[in-house]
Regions:
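Interfacial helix-loop-helix junctions of multi-pass membrane proteins
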Residues: 200-202, 244, 276-302
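N-terminal transmembrane-helix/juxtamembrane module of multi-pass inner/ER membrane proteins
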Residues: 2-66, 85-160
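Interfacial segments of alpha-helical transmembrane regions
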Residues: 88-96, 161-210
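Membrane-interface loop-to-helix entry segments
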Residues: 145-159, 240-261, 289, 293
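Membrane-proximal cytoplasmic C-terminal regulatory module of class A 7TM GPCRs
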Residues: 309-347
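Membrane-interfacial catalytic/cofactor-binding modules of polytopic membrane enzymes
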Residues: 195-262, 325
Length: 359
């Protein structure tokens, strides 16, 4: 075999992967949820400072390695021009980073033991005409409804994955906006939790689990114990949700509903699901009404900030919806032969065109 023919052989797989990785990093950063990463990096820095200063021991080596692997895969796939799989990997990395950073940071903030504000939050509800005790007993007296609300409340565990897969194809730019808005919302809600810590209405009104024998979710009674432990010296990281005000669950319900608008056909069911999830935040999550109002306001503010940032800083066009690609158009052309599906597609595309023109 001649030297020329030898040099023409394919490079080893690792060299190809390394070339894709190096080529993909700059473009991945341009296409990524950059603002979300900046917010998470700031939170990670604060977590490191507070952990050292307050004596928390936190060394998540396994999850950190998983995060690095996901980012490397995202960069390599970007370099290979597999942009939708790269988007999935990058978003999975953000979700991993969120789990790594946010619950431990909430634990550190709770341990700073700022004065509890339950009385003030309950008073705001009362001035809005809300009788929280009567409302809680009404839900208790309707156990079937409460059971449904509990299952809907838990949908925030699987909705991010469903939206990740659906929006990667249907509307990648909407996915990036939702991920970024969620990161900003988390940062703001943690800051609110630090300034206005609270245990929740079940604790404030002295309800016990015996008062709600059919309750499935016991976190409204466990959450005050976790917070009290941190406030009195415990240095164990808590990975359960302990933020009361503003309600991140309510904020995420609003952001999820907006995200589902970008999903053809089934998006309307996602919107309805999140309307119910927003309501379930009160009896199941144990939130004051003002928590929900503040959470919704934070979500809208965060979404506006995300839109403004990317509009001002993007240097390359966003990844287009799959329905506008060659493969997507062929698929839609085949579906248009079916009258019912054709009507749904036309309606969805018409709505998407209006939203694009408005943006």
């Amino acid at each position: 075999m001649s030297i020329a023919s030898f040099t023409a052989l394919p490079k080893p797989m690792w060299e190809v992967a390394w070339a894709y990785l190096r080529a993909g990093i700059p473009e991945l950063w341009q296409r990524s949820s950059r603002l979300a990463w900046m917010v998470l990096a700031g939170c990670a820095g604060l977590l490191a400072i507070l952990s050292i200063a307050m004596g928390f021991h936190y060394a998540p080596f396994l999850l950190s390695a998983q995060l690095v692997i996901l980012l490397a895969l995202a960069a390599g796939l970007t370099g290979a021009r597999w942009l939708r799989p790269a988007l999935i990997m990058e978003t999975a990395a953000i979700l991993t980073a969120t789990f790594l950073i946010v619950p431990p940071l909430c634990s550190a903030l709770a341990a700073m033991a700022m004065p509890l504000q339950d009385a003030a939050l309950a008073e705001i509800d009362r001035r809005m005409g809300i009788d929280w005790i009567a409302m809680a007993f009404w839900f208790r007296d309707n156990p079937e409804l409460s059971r449904v609300l509990c299952h809907v409340y838990a949908s925030n565990l699987w909705q991010p994955v469903a939206l990740l897969l659906a929006l990667t194809a249907a509307d990648p730019e909407r996915l990036r906006l939702m991920i970024t808005a969620s990161a900003i919302t988390l940062a703001i809600t943690m800051f609110g939790f630090f300034l206005i810590p609270a245990m929740g209405p079940y604790w404030y009104f002295h309800f016990t689990p015996a008062d709600f024998p059919d309750a499935i979710n016991v976190m409204p009674w466990e959450q005050p114990k976790l917070i009290e432990g941190l406030r009195t010296g415990s240095r164990e990281m808590v990975f359960s949700g302990i933020v009361e005000f503003p309600s991140y669950h309510a904020a995420s319900a609003l952001l999820f509903a907006i995200a589902w608008r970008g999903v053809p056909v089934i998006g309307v069911f996602g919107i309805l699901l999140n309307i119910v999830m927003f309501v379930s935040t009160v009896p199941v999550g144990g939130h004051y009404i003002i928590d929900l109002c503040a959470g919704a306001a934070v979500a809208l503010l965060s979404l506006s900030l995300a839109k403004r940032y990317y509009r001002a800083t993007d240097r390359i066009p966003p990844l287009e919806p799959w329905t506008r690609t060659r493969e997507g158009r062929r698929f839609l052309a085949a579906l248009r032969k079916r009258p019912i599906v054709s009507a749904l597609i036309k309606r969805t595309l018409k709505t998407s065109s209006k939203e694009a023109a408005t943006a």
